[in-house]
Amino acid sequence: MKAVGLFGRKYVNVERREYDLGEIGPNDALVEVKASGVCGTDLNFLRDSDDCFHPLGHELSGEVLEIGSCVRNVKPGDKVVIEDVAACGCCRDCQEGNISLCRSLIDGEGRPGMATHYKVNAHCLVPFDGISFEAASLTEPLAVGITATQESDIPFGGSVVVFGHGPIGLFVARCAKLRGAGFVAVVGMGTGTPFGDKRFGAARALGADLTIEGRKVGVADEVRKVLPNGADRVIVTAPPVVVPDAVNCCRFGGRVSVLGLSFGGHEVVPLNVNQIVFNKIDVKGVIAEPAMHFRQAIDLLKSKAVDPDVFITDYVTFDTFEQRMRDVLEQKIPAIKVCLRPNPTE
C-alpha cells in the first residue's frame, strides 16, 4: 500500500512524498492517521538541520485498518495512539525490569507520522476511547512530561523550575503540580507579545506559581527572590544554551534534569563543572525512549486533569503545513501545539 507523508529540513523546506509501506507482516498493523502533533524536534529539523530531509511527526493517533495474523492486542476499527519508540521486551535490560534502558527499540523504521497511513509493529499501539483523535495526539508529549517529572524525583511539596514554555515545558509544569510540587516556576520568553503571553497564560492556567521572562531578567536572581536557597529540581525543556542558568537556579544537593535538544552546533554549551561538583548537583539526561506512561497520559487527558484545549491552538492540513510552520518559527502566530489532520473529513 502507498502512503503520503511529510519530510523536512532547514529552512522550512518541506517535501510531500509518496512511498510504499510494504506488506503487512504477521505482527504489524496498518493505521489510518487521524491527527499528528508538531513536536519541538520537528521544528528543530525545519529550522536547523541541513544534512538531510527528516521524516516529520511522531505524535499520532488514528484508526486501525488492518492487522497481521499474529496480532491480538488490537483489531480493525480500534482507535489507537502509537508509541513512536517501544521497548522490545526481549533484551537483557527489559527482562531484568530496566525497560527504560532498552536499546533494541521498536520504531517506525524511518517513516513519518505526519502521513496518511502508518505501518508499525502492533506492539506499539495503545487503544483509547472517550477523547478525540486530536486530544489523543497529545498522549506522546504528555507521556514525556510524566517521564521527565518521574525521573526528576520531585519531593512532595518541593520546588521546581521549568525552563521552556513550549508544549513539553507546559506538560512538565502540569505534571510537577500533579506529582505534589508545592511551587512551580516556568521560564520562557516573549512577554508582551501574543506568542509569549499565550504561553505564559497557559502556564498559569496549568498551575504555575511564577512565570519568568528569561530574556529580560537574571533568571537565577528571580528564582532566588522566592527560593533563597534555590530550587529542589530544575527541568530543562528549552534548548541547551540555558543549562548554565538552570544550574545557577538549583539548590545545594538538588537535581537538574535536561531533556531539551538542539542541532546545528547549538547543542554544545560551556558549563562550570566546579559549580556542579562543589554544590553536589545531580545533572541527569532524560529522554522518553522507549515510550512509557501512555495509558496514564490517556487517563489524564480523559479526566481533563490535563486539559487538551489549553494545548492545541491550531490545526493544519498538508496544504497549509509549510506556511504555518514558518509562522510558528517566526512567532507570527501565538501557537502552543499545532495539530496536523492528514486525512481531513471536512
Stretch-by-stretch model annotation:
Residues 131-216, 221:
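Mid-domain Rossmann-like dinucleotide-binding core that forms the NAD(H)/NADP(H) cofactor-binding site
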